[in-house]
């Protein structure tokens, strides 16, 4: 033994000891916070297991069930047991939300949370091990609090989630193991090792003190040896050296052969008494203030200061040099429980900066309409329309902004007191936000009554002539505009870009036609087409365009709509240059189903569901992202042979990267120049891949952004107005914010807050405008020049509204289309500020909507496994021709038009992505 020895101690191992201790004492809130801050996890897990663990700890139960789908086909995997564990945890958390609200005397909101709990219980029935287990779960519904049950006396969400993972980890460890060459011995602290080391350290200090007393002649009795133990301050023997060991080594061997009495050490531990406030705050904070599924509870951060700070720290407003990509995150969102897979499939969009190519997907005036010989065409029933402004329009999110310098940090002396008041402050903030929401509801009710009164006053008598109808309609609209102006509702910040609606009415009246509709949205007047082309020549939208094209966007001509348009199959007149003739068909043509308008050309099959597809702006490539974490870039065929549809070929894969993300790829998007490919995933990361379209290879390291604290549902690009670089727009679950990122500088720009539910869809146009669709049943328009929300469009025109799963804006920037979870599509006049029509093209969730580059057709994909095209070349206030153009064997997730040809891509849960083309 040398005079100096070295002992290696890793701080990571010390943290693992602490994590093991916190886990053994069920202090899981502190354990998870330490994991997040240190980045250390006590255990040896594979990447897949770590990802599954994070999903469970975040409470993303639908994501967990989807992640584990590949294992469910294996016989050894206990699918029933796994689903029982996950759904039971989901049910208990729903009960926790309900109980917390009932404890706060909010009976008017119980129906929302109780409905969620009952749905979870219903799903659990088929997976319960026995009827007794199911009966016990049913009994929990009758208790005023979940913690009143003896089995759940100390239940809290954080501890329950940790135990949930430990239980399922044993089940899936065999299928997704860690490195088999490694042992957990060097990676995991266990058996309460920290406590053992503390006790051994105390005994060591006692031994040192006793030996020193013997050497110096100081008398210490045997009973006094352990009396001087001080765990916090020690006994003065603080020097870390090997003197004791060196002394023992110099003792003769005969000393160790002496007989001695073996003594037992009894350890009495005074257990920690947790404060009751801490436990109750834990029940309330993660599940009520952020994750509650009902609208009266804020679904974002429970403390408004965080949201205020986010808004006040905009670089454009405060001159900061960087964005908010690294601001603190809270645990992920559990709210907005919806139908299966409803928030799993995001849509992606791709902005373009060039004009359309010469073919314009065969939409020019020299091509035949795709509806001329369609065997599956149908007319969509039009719901009762209300030609009024949107149900909800407001500036920003409705919360008052507070400057960043307005919040003063508490002095250290008051820090402990402030921490004790956290729970009370959260309650106060919750009630403040609830009051704001109630005031908002009262305002909406007043607007609804006003609209109803205006309809009664301005209703059109069917016996009146068309001229009188026109006058009544104009009077009604003028009163609507006046009332809405008084309520300060609208997109005032857009200025001259929003024409007055009554001027549109006057223009329609002066056309000389007997049109009973207020405005023809199908086409602008002929004499204004050049002006519109000039206005939109430089518009950049999320629709990809051909870089080499110089042609202008063609616009439609006005189509007069007389009373004959009310027939079952309306006659829609084509534009003057269209050679397609009359688009209506005879009964014989309707019965002929032998000819398909669109046929399958290429089909790519994956091992799991394919979520995301995106055409390169040039149209020569398209990107595919799937649940298997694989990113592919495929070649678009140079020659389209529609006659070979009976035997579709596999596309040529030019680029492939396995495990591009740790989780499923939810969305993909190309930059306007086509040199960047962005992907979003449920691993909460956005990756931007520099890509060379000519060589089909990555040209540099990936850019990785981690500003989101939930699944990224959608991505879109727009060209930066100042730097010329690509600006990435991303949104999803978690904090429900929209983030803008300068990809050239790798810096965050803005964090746009306002939505109160998962953001499912994004779309960009005009170089600064963004449309977002959300689980909160609204569409919001954002102007990056401000930057803030400039308009809110609700979906509650009919019934209770529905979550918005997809949004799109036509190339002219005049018309918004939405796809919603109640199987409906909404067409909304952006400039006029009113809904044009809401119709139901599908029988299930509409997950994808896209305008063709010429805005002649609207492509929709749905969970009903069908892909349909709506003809927009007529009066959009009337019934619209509809045609089935494709079908999958499972849910359709995304559909995207080609940039030039009359072709489109569709992705599906049947694990395929299909390229369809017009058969002519």
Curated annotation (Swiss-Prot):
Compositional bias (Basic and acidic residues) at which positions? 371-380
User: Which stretches does the entry tag as region Disordered?
Assistant: 371-422, 501-594
Cleavable signal peptide: none
List each copy of the LisH domain by range.
10-42
Q: Is the keyword Transcription regulation in the record?
A: no
Q: Does the keyword Hydrolase apply?
A: no
Query: By its UniProt entry, which SUPFAM superfamilies does this protein fall under?
Result: WD40 repeat-like
Residues forming the CTLH domain are 45-102
Where is this protein localized, as stated in its record?
A: Cytoplasm, Cytoskeleton
Q: Sorted alphabetically, which keywords does the UniProt record give? A: Cytoplasm, Cytoskeleton, Developmental protein, Microtubule, Phosphoprotein, Repeat, WD repeat
Q: Which GO terms describe its cellular component?
A: axon; cytoplasm; dendrite; growth cone; microtubule; neuron projection; neuronal cell body
Compositionally biased intervals (Polar residues): 538-552
Q: What residues bear Phosphothreonine in this entry? A: 285, 543
Q: Where is this protein chiefly located?
A: cytoplasm
Low complexity bias: start-end ranges? 506-523
User: Which InterPro entries does this one have?
Assistant: CTLH_C, LisH, TPL_SMU1_LisH-like, WD40/YVTN_repeat-like_dom_sf, WD40_repeat_CS, WD40_repeat_dom_sf, WD40_rpt, WDR47
BP-aspect Gene Ontology terms:
adult locomotory behavior; anterior commissure morphogenesis; autophagy; brain development; cerebral cortex development; cerebral cortex radial glia-guided migration; corpus callosum development; detection of hot stimulus involved in thermoception
Q: Which residues carry this modification: Phosphoserine?
A: 289, 292, 297, 312, 423
GO MF annotations, alphabetized: protein-containing complex binding
The residue spans of each WD repeat are 605-644, 660-699, 707-749, 754-792, 799-838, 841-880, 887-919
Q: Can you tell which superkingdom this protein's organism belongs to?
A: Eukaryota
Q: Which organs or tissues contain this protein?
A: Enriched in the nervous system (at protein level).
> What is its quaternary makeup?
Interacts with MAP1S (via WD repeats).
Q: What is this protein called?
A: WD repeat-containing protein 47
From which source organism is this entry?
Answer: Mus musculus
């Amino acid at each position: 033994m040398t005079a100096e020895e070295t002992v290696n101690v890793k701080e990571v191992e010390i943290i693992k000891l602490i994590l093991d201790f916190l886990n053994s004492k069920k202090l899981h809130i502190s354990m998870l916070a330490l994991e997040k801050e240190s980045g250390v996890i006590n255990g040896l897990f594979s990447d897949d297991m770590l990802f599954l663990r994070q999903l469970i700890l975040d409470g993303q139960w639908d994501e967990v069930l989807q992640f584990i789908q590949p294992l469910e086909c294996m016989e050894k995997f206990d699918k029933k047991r796994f689903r029982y564990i996950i759904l039971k945890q989901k049910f208990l958390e729903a009960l926790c939300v309900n109980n917390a609200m009932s404890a706060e005397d909010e009976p008017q909101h119980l129906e929302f949370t109780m409905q969620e709990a009952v749905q979870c219980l219903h799903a659990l029935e088929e997976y319960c091990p026995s009827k007794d287990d199911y009966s016990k779960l049913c009994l929990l519904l009758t208790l005023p609090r979940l913690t009143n049950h003896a089995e759940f006396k100390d239940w809290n969400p954080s501890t329950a989630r940790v135990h949930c993972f430990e239980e399922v980890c044993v089940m899936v460890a065999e299928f997704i193991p860690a490195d088999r060459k490694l042992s957990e011995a060097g990676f995991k602290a266990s058996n309460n090792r920290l406590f053992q080391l503390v006790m051994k350290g105390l005994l060591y200090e006692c031994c040192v003190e006793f030996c020193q007393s013997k050497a110096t002649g100081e008398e210490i009795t045997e009973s006094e040896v352990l009396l001087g133990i001080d765990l916090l301050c020690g006994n003065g023997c603080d020097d870390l050296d090997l003197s004791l060991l060196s002394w023992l080594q110099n003792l003769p061997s005969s000393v160790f052969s002496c007989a001695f009495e073996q003594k037992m050490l009894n350890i009495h531990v005074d257990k920690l008494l947790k404060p009751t406030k801490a436990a109750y705050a834990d029940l309330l904070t993660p599940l009520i203030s952020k994750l509650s599924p009902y609208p009266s509870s804020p679904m974002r951060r429970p403390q408004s200061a965080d949201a205020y700070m986010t808004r006040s720290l905009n670089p454009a407003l405060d001159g900061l040099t960087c964005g908010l990509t690294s601001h603190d995150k809270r645990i992920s969102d559990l709210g907005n429980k919806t139908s299966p897979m409803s928030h799993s499939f995001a849509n992606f969009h791709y902005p373009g900066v060039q004009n359309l190519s010469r073919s314009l997907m065969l939409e020019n005036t020299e091509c035949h309409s795709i509806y001329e010989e369609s065997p599956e065409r149908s007319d969509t029933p039009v719901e009762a329309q209300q030609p009024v402004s949107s149900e909800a329009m407001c500036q920003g999110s409705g919360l008052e902004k507070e400057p960043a310098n307005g919040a003063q940090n508490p002095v250290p002396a008051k820090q402990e007191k402030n921490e004790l008041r956290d729970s009370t402050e959260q309650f106060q903030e919750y009630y403040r936000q609830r009051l704001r929401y109630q005031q908002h509801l009262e305002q909406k009710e007043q607007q609804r009554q006003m609209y109803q009164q205006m309809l009664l006053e301005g209703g059109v008598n069917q016996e009146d002539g068309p001229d009188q109808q026109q006058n009544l309609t104009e009077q009604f609209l003028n009163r609507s505009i006046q009332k809405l102006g008084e309520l300060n509702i609208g997109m005032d910040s857009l200025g001259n870009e929003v024409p007055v609606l009554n001027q549109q009415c006057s223009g329609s009246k002066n056309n000389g036609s007997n049109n009973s509709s207020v405005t023809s949205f199908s086409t602008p007047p002929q004499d204004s087409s050049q002006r519109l082309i000039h206005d939109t020549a430089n518009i950049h939208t999320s629709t990809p365009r051909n870089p080499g094209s110089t042609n202008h966007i063609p616009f439609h001509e006005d189509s007069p709509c007389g009373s004959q348009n009310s027939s079952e199959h309306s006659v829609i007149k084509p534009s003057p240059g269209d050679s397609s003739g009359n688009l209506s068909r005879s009964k014989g043509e309707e019965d002929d189903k032998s000819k398909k308008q669109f046929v399958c050309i290429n089909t790519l099959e994956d091992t799991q569901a394919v979520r995301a597809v995106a055409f390169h702006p040039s149209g020569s490539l398209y990107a595919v992202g799937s649940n298997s974490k694989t990113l592919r870039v495929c070649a678009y065929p140079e020659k389209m042979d529609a006659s070979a549809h009976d035997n579709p070929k596999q596309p040529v894969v030019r680029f492939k990267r396995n495990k591009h993300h740790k989780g499923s790829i939810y969305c993909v998007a190309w930059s306007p120049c086509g040199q960047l490919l962005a992907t979003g995933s449920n691993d909460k990361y956005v990756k931007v891949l520099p890509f060379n379209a000519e060589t089909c290879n990555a040209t540099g390291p990936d850019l990785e952004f981690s500003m989101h604290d939930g699944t990224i549902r959608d991505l879109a690009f727009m060209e930066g107005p100042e730097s010329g670089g690509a600006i990435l727009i991303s949104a999803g679950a978690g904090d429900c914010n929209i983030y803008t990122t300068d990809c050239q500088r790798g810096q965050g720009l803005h964090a746009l807050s306002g939505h109160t539910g998962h953001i499912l869809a994004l779309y960009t146009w005009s170089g600064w405008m963004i449309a977002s669709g959300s689980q909160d049943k609204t569409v919001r328009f954002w102007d990056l020049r401000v930057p803030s929300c400039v308009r809110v469009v609700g979906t509650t025109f009919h019934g209770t509204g529905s979550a918005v799963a997809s949004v799109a804006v036509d190339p002219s920037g005049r018309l918004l289309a939405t796809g919603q979870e109640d199987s409906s599509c909404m067409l909304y006049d952006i400039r006029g500020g009113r809904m044009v029509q809401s119709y139901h093209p599908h029988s299930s969730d509409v997950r994808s909507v896209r305008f063709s580059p010429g805005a002649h057709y609207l492509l929709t994909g749905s969970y009903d496994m069908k892909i349909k095209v709506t003809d927009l070349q007529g009066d959009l206030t009337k019934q619209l021709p509809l045609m089935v153009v494709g079908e999958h064997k499972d849910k359709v997730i995304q559909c995207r038009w080609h940039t030039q040809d009359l072709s489109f891509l569709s992705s599906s849960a049947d694990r395929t992505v299909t390229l369809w083309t017009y058969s002519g």
